[in-house]
From Swiss-Prot:
Gene name in the database record: crq
Highest taxon above the source species: Eukaryota
Protein function: Macrophage receptor for apoptotic cells. Up-regulates Bfc, which in turn leads to self-up-regulation by Bfc in a positive feedback mechanism in response to detection of apoptotic cells.
Other information: 'Croquemort' means literally 'the one who bites dead persons' in French and is colloquial for undertaker.
Post-translational modifications: N-glycosylated and/or O-glycosylated.
Membrane-topology annotation of the record: Multi-pass membrane protein
Pfam hit, one: CD36
GO cellular component: membrane; plasma membrane
Tissue specificity of this protein: Found on hemocytes from hemolymph, and later in the development, on macrophages that contain apoptotic cell corpses.
The protein, known as: Protein croquemort
Annotated localization: Cell membrane
Transmembrane segments: 13-33, 452-472
Glycosylation sites: 72, 104, 110, 129, 189, 198, 216, 260, 446
Triggers of expression: Up-regulated in response to detection of apoptotic cells.
Length: 491
């Protein structure tokens, strides 16, 4: 029997000893585990070989889709009739699976890494509404670019260019398959002529025109990125320091020309859900500020939605801090709110970007053409990011590309046409966190809580031991006597 092999003192030592040990361990866990857990999570999120973040950064672990919606210009022959608006019919989506892979990366001692990113696209017919052979009519981008570059030249120069446009295939509009409009590109007589007999006046840097021609599988198209790894300060994780080796883009006046923000695929943990976030868009050679607007639930995670607002694509009309995105010398010519000029960035072509269907843009752009139906649910640009870990949960990067067509009596092709910002296409870059990665994110979020719960459980367990010991001591019942023991004591 226990009472015969273990005395009262020994039992007290065991009960009070174990109770004290569990109590001490529980208190230590409750006090110190949150800091330890935070360090473990932050270490796993830093960009260095061996971490999960590093592996996910090297090659995107989730499918990314890029959907194109083309605008088919149905009445180009009426462009000189001021009573008839250009009419556009949306076609698509034409969806591509997008693969990202970091290459030629170099880690530096100042907690940064420089790298190129190769992006590859594969057409996904099942997610598309149409084929790449669908025909689309749109404004002739090469002709528009040449005319725009020559607009302020002397009359004699413009006469020569007008002759060239008339005899080398210059057109107001062109009809081509979707595939050629996007990645394949199409051969053009004007492009051939300018590449053969080029002058310093007109620079056409490509042999085939396509909105993303020469981009598929290109290593260098997006440029050289340098970002913070977060190894010295986790709050800097993913922040862009240089693009193509420079801290300024050279395309806009400061401070709009600064290389700022993240590339959109990595954010630091412990984000302030009341602050704006900044992403750098290489296609526009500029940063974009997104504002927090509510939350988004997915896979059991609660993410904060950061969205594009009226300020995001304003050029100073309503938000003076954005004025440096347009040339001060010709501020009166700057686009109205919701549309930004990309001419300097996009090979001098008269390209302007907006949100799809001119969502959040000045109403005049919507009214100038037929077929625009801006809707928040379909056309809002947003990133949903889990703020504790900085993990993107869902992304819809939606941008529309437009081209300016305007009259010029020195060019036969543009004589008498309406001045209109023509929608060409819009795209939606979409990605969603997988359930597997969401589970890892939830573990990281709750790791501190799990430890605290375990610590309090140990404290509760220790309390049972100690309360039991105190109770037995007060009632003097440490040794439970059996009838046999009573007989021994009474005889």
């Amino acid at each position: 029997m226990c009472c015969k092999c273990c005395g009262e003192t020994q039992r007290k030592v065991w009960v009070f000893g174990l109770g004290s040990v569990f109590l001490l361990l529980g208190i230590l866990i409750v006090v110190f585990w949150p800091g330890i857990a935070d360090n473990l999570v932050e270490d796993g999120l830093t960009l260095k070989p061996g971490t999960d973040a590093y592996e996910s950064w090297l090659e995107a672990p989730i499918p990314i889709y890029l959907s194109f919606y083309m605008f088919n210009w149905t009445n180009p022959e009426d462009i000189r009739n001021p009573d008839i608006k250009p009419n556009f019919v949306e076609m698509g989506p034409y969806t591509f699976l997008e693969k990202h892979k970091k290459e030629n990366y170099t880690f530096y001692d100042n907690a940064t890494v420089a790298y190129y990113e190769r992006r590859t696209w594969f057409f996904d017919p099942e997610r598309s509404n149409g084929t790449l052979d669908d025909m689309v009519t749109a404004a002739h981008a090469i002709t528009a670019t040449v005319a725009d570059e020559m607009r302020d030249q002397r009359k004699i120069v413009k006469k020569i260019i007008n002759f060239m446009l008339n005899h080398e295939g210059g057109k107001l509009y062109v009809t081509k398959p979707v595939g050629e409009w996007i990645f394949e590109g199409y051969q053009d007589n004007i492009t051939d002529f300018l590449n053969l007999f080029n002058t310093t006046k007109i620079d056409i840097p490509y042999k085939r025109f396509g909105w993303l021609a020469d981009r598929n599988e290109s290593l260098t198209y997006d440029g050289l990125f340098t970002i913070h790894t977060g190894t010295d300060d986790i709050s800097n994780l993913g922040r862009l320091t240089h693009w193509n080796g420079k801290s300024e883009t050279g395309f806009y006046e400061m401070p709009c020309g600064i290389v700022n923000g993240t590339t959109g695929d990595m954010f630091p943990p412990k984000m302030n859900v009341n602050d704006e976030i900044t992403i750098f868009a290489t296609d526009a050679c500029r940063f974009m500020n997104l504002r927090p607007r509510g939350t988004y639930e997915n896979h059991g995670l609660t993410a904060t939605k950061w969205v594009g607002t009226e300020e995001t694509l304003d050029s100073g009309e309503n938000y003076p801090n954005q004025a440096c995105f347009c040339d001060e010398a010709r501020f009166d010519e700057c686009p109205k709110t919701g549309v930004v000029e990309c001419k300097a960035c996009r090979d001098k072509a008269p390209i302007y970007s907006s949100f799809p269907h001119f969502y959040l843009a000045d109403q005049s752009y919507v009214d100038a053409v037929s077929g625009m139906k801006p809707e928040k649910e379909k056309h809002e640009f947003f990133l949903a990011v889990e703020p504790i870990t900085g993990v993107p949960v869902q992304v819809h990067g939606r941008i529309q590309i437009n081209m300016m067509i305007e009259p010029d009596d020195d060019f036969d092709i543009y004589r008498g046409v309406q001045k209109v910002l023509m929608p060409m296409f819009w795209f939606d870059q979409y990605a969603e966190l997988s359930s597997e990665l969401a589970s890892k994110a939830k573990l990281a979020i709750n790791l501190s809580s799990y430890g605290i719960i375990f610590g309090y459980s140990m404290i509760a367990f220790a309390s049972v031991f100690l309360i039991t010991g105190i109770t037995l001591t007060v009632t003097k019942k440490w040794v439970r006597r059996t009838p046999e023991d009573e007989d021994i004591l009474t005889n």
